[in-house]
Regions:
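Hydrophobic anchor at the beta1->P-loop junction of P-loop NTPases
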Residues: 5
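The conserved Walker
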Residues: 9
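Walker A/P-loop
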Residues: 14
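Post-Walker A helix-loop "phosphate-sensing" segment adjacent to the P-loop in P-loop NTPases
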Residues: 22-28
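ATP-dependent small-molecule kinase phosphotransfer cores
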Residues: 30-97
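Conserved phosphate-donor/acceptor-positioning beta-strand/loop module used by diverse small-molecule
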Residues: 100-102, 114-135
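Small-molecule kinase domains that catalyze NTP-dependent phosphoryl transfer to phosphate-bearing small molecules
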Residues: 135-190, 195-202
Length: 202
């Protein structure tokens, strides 16, 4: 079973993954060819794997990715004409258990490309809660720009989320990331709990 934590920016997705990783759970990292200074300080807390453009081209040519697309916040990167990409390699997906994605990234995936059983952890936090995290963590990207882009995906998000074969969904709103991490951890250790949890949290 693969566990994919889904939510808009500032929902606490990465905090959940960090807690799990500290407990020994294997968490996959996305890649980007965006320079480390920008990836670390502005976009994803340094949680991307840094790849060269050559690496990105090889992944693309070998079709060795779960998703890959041009970096969606390119309008904020006006310092260079270089194209930047982000994605999740097939190797990372096959060798880890937990992943973090935005709705925008999930829409880049063909449901047929995922053969494993999947449990989506949907962190549907309110704008107020996400704004609080944005200011508390002193994030520096444009909240309104990110909100505008990600909000476009939400209208068809629910239907798409349930379109994956062999998928389960756990839904949380404004939940403490530590509690979400504890539930994922228990599911990884005791997979038979999945039916109880999906019935309780849908």
């Amino acid at each position: 079973m693969k566990y994919i934590i889904i939510g808009m920016h500032c929902a606490g997705k990465q905090e959940v993954a960090d807690i799990l990783e500290n407990k020994g759970i294997k968490c996959g990292r996305q890649f980007t060819n965006l320079e480390n200074t920008f990836a670390a300080n502005i976009y994803n807390g340094g949680n991307y794997e840094q790849y060269t453009m050559k690496d990105v081209n090889e992944i693309f040519e070998n079709n060795a990715y779960i998703f890959m697309h041009e970096f969606p916040w390119g309008n904020e990167l006006n310092f260079s004409p270089i194209k930047y990409y982000e994605g999740l390699s097939l190797y990372e997906f096959e060798n880890n258990d937990v992943f973090v994605m935005s709705p925008h990234q999930l829409f880049s995936i063909s449901p047929a490309s995922i053969k494993d059983d999947v449990c989506f952890i949907w962190m549907d936090n309110t704008k107020k809660e996400r704004l609080n995290r944005y200011y508390t963590e002193k994030r520096t990207y444009s909240f309104s720009n990110r909100e505008e882009i990600e909000s476009k995906d939400m209208n068809s998000f629910v239907k798409f989320l349930y379109g994956f074969d062999k998928s389960r969904v756990l839904y949380f709103t404004n939940e403490d990331p530590a509690r979400v991490a504890a539930i994922i951890y228990s599911l990884i250790k005791y997979p038979d709990l999945i039916n109880i949890y999906t019935e309780a949290y849908n």
